[in-house]
Amino acid sequence: MNQSIKVLITGTSQGIGKAIAEYFLEMGHKVIGIDRQEPSIFHSMYSHHQCDISDYKSLPEIDDVEILINNAGTQNENDIDINLKALIKVTEKYGIQKHIRSILNIGSAS
């Protein structure tokens, strides 16, 4: 079995982010989710932080992230604040860590 890695994903309460989180959990990895909504994933290897990623000061302290997946997004009057500015702030906070392996930025619209 592969060694467990620590994956941080934004926007894990529904849609693409939830599916990605569930995939990494099935593979035996530790997943940390950040979302404005309450958790929708209940798994022993999952922890959830409920906050608004556009508020940099509210981002939790999380160390030793190995994979960062910026998935949170919106289509409303705040889309630049979430889809661009928050992505940059999240990457600055978690993407420049000693153990980081990969950063994936996801953008979608329907």
Functional labels for PLM-detected ranges:
Residues M27-I41:
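Conserved glycine-rich Rossmann-like NAD(P)H-binding loop of the short-chain dehydrogenase/reductase
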Residues S13-E22:
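N-terminal Rossmann NAD(P)H-binding glycine-rich loop of SDR-like oxidoreductase domains
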